[in-house]
């Protein structure tokens, strides 16, 4: 692979966001070089394992990793089902070696269209027992939730939970669609929910989890600054909002950065941050006994 630079510092601007980009699609272009190095299933397995090892180094005890096998397969035309198998194996290796508990979430990359996403779903279903949830990510504006209703029905029928990227590049109606058409119990980003009081009421009444991503939302120009992020308002309203990293390698962050630097800059007090962490445990895709075991481990 011919890289655009021959030093880590020279390569960094091509694979990380160095400053705010115009929009989400500009942010997503940073993935191109990362996907380029996934030349075969062995590379996919290694990356999956190293993600778990990185989490251990960060002091993380429980990790939910999400991946789009179709996207990972595109650069070198790898069999999509083999990508799923490789990720499952790599995560299992990493978990055994580190003791980090990991759950996998399959992503349908909406930007490739409904037909490609159906192929992606079929590949994910070959390892249905190793996944806990199905996600929809990518170009929210041009590929709305209604295109993927059948995909998510099949996912729910397989026993998976549903989390959907919505309310980031799209408005509050995109969040409504994720909830009502796809059956989401968690929403990634959900920034635009603040524009719709009825939606805010619904999120509270139905205990919908919100996966907030502070640094990422500033970098993608979803919000103009950390201070303008609605996370504090979500928490003050009693919503099940949490603090996440989104794409940590592209954003150049770790969870500690979000908790210790980004969250205070967004107006969160230590009490807000503790509540967000309690919310994270509540909405985690874990069985009650698994949550209890995790609490006992970190006491």
What are these model-derived regions, one by one?
Residues 165:
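Short HxH-centered metal-ligating active-site micro-motif
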